[in-house]
Regions:
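Conserved active-site-proximal phosphate/metal-binding subdomains
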Residues: 1-30, 219, 238-261, 271-339
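An N-cap/entry alpha-helix motif that binds or orients negatively charged groups
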Residues: 2-80, 332
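Structural signal for hydrophobic packing residues in well-ordered secondary-structure cores
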Residues: 49-59, 112, 116, 164-167, ...
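Outer membrane beta-barrel
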Residues: 80-89
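N-terminal binding-site loop/beta-alpha segment at the start of enzyme catalytic domains
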Residues: 90-98
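Short glycine-enriched loops at secondary-structure junctions
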Residues: 90-91, 123-128, 176
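Alpha/beta enzyme core
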Residues: 99, 109-110, 138-139, 151-267, ...
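A gly/proline- and charged-residue-enriched helix-loop-helix capping module
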Residues: 103-152
Length: 339
């Protein structure tokens, strides 16, 4: 199966909101929720994509040859590549009923684990979303990261218990989901967390905790203060607030602020190719998350579709490393890109 075939297959079954575009840039779906769009006009999602495209790579083939080593270590686990599938929940609402959260996560989590990476899984107002995600992670031997929404503390405790029961190697919370309307309308309301509240949640995890949705140096420092083992520089794929900067724009300053602290820096938002992955690593990220294209891969080809997309990313990353003189991820440096 080729990647164009995956996209073509997805268009037949992914539903009316997502167009399975050849380039997933947020233009066709920009203001569609339900769907992969945004609650506003969607300009942040489009900016995410545009800013990665503006960054250029500095080719330099006057170097020793060899096959690049793309392995990355994260929380004591070794992964074949420095990219991970991002979290999504309620796929039958935002995409189509060709998959439920159970069948989607079964395919995604297993395929990612079998191909050397891990999947972050989603959450939702329907309790079965987290239940199904954590069951899939448990079936994959804990190779996955349950991502909990910033609910009220009682709900978080329930979700955290499910996450820990899966044997997952880390837990995440997408704090930027505070901008989703359905969270604000809850009783008691869910949403933003203080450093003190976040610290309590970190302790509940009893394993590395990842704070997803950091867009400022101040926010990164707050996450560190609360005890986070990693952050994800993220604006929720541009879904929760218009007029935000792109993740590529803020990544360098956030990575610099956390350098040497032991807190890992991941990034998402508009990253679509192995070249984009290279750019993110050059700007200071330890790894990246990619969400929407993995949804397309599942709908377009199941486990084979996921493998096809992973192989595509891996090939592009390795080729870019070779053409820029990087033999390992540690050798990818800021001077290898032009911002």
């Amino acid at each position: 199966m080729t990647y164009p075939e995956v996209l073509a297959n997805a268009r037949e079954c992914i539903g009316k909101y997502c167009k399975a575009c050849p380039v997933c840039n947020g233009v066709a779906c920009k203001n569609q929720i339900p769907g992969p769009g945004a609650k506003g006009v969607g300009d942040t999602a489009i900016r995410n994509d545009n800013k990665w495209a503006e960054i250029r790579v500095n080719m330099d083939t006057l170097c020793e040859g060899g096959t690049p080593d793309t392995h990355v270590e994260l929380f004591g686990k070794s992964f074949k590549y420095p990219f991970f599938a991002g979290p999504v929940g309620a796929v039958n609402l935002h995409y189509s009923e060709a998959y439920t959260d159970m069948t989607y996560n079964d395919v995604l989590v297993r395929a990612c684990a079998e191909n050397g990476i891990a999947a972050f899984t989603g959450d939702g107002t329907n309790p079965t979303v987290m239940e199904m995600a954590t069951k899939a992670i448990g079936a994959a031997g804990g190779c996955g990261v349950p991502t909990i929404k910033p609910w009220n503390i009682d709900t978080i405790k329930e979700k955290m218990a499910q996450a820990k029961a899966s044997g997952c190697f880390a837990v995440a919370m997408d704090v930027d989901a505070a901008g989703l309307p359905f969270l604000k309308n809850m009783t008691p309301p869910a949403g933003s967390k203080s450093v003190e509240e976040l610290a309590e949640i970190v302790k509940l995890a009893e394993r590395p905790f990842i704070v997803k949705g950091v867009m400022t140096v101040k926010g990164a420092q707050k996450a560190k203060e609360a005890g986070a083992a990693a952050i994800v520089v993220s604006n929720h794929g541009g879904r929760v607030l218009d007029q935000c900067p792109a993740t590529a724009e803020v990544l360098p300053e956030i990575a610099a602020a956390l350098k040497g602290t032991g807190v890992k820096v991941l990034v998402d938002g508009g990253i679509r190719t192995g070249v984009d992955v290279f750019k993110a690593l050059a700007l200071g990220a330890d790894g990246v998350l990619i969400c929407r294209p993995f949804v397309t891969a599942v709908y377009g080809g199941g486990e084979e579709g996921v493998k096809c997309y992973i192989d595509k990313l891996a090939g592009e990353l390795a080729d870019t490393m070779q053409m820029c003189g990087a033999h390992s991820l540690a050798e990818i440096t800021p001077d290898m890109v032009r911002v």
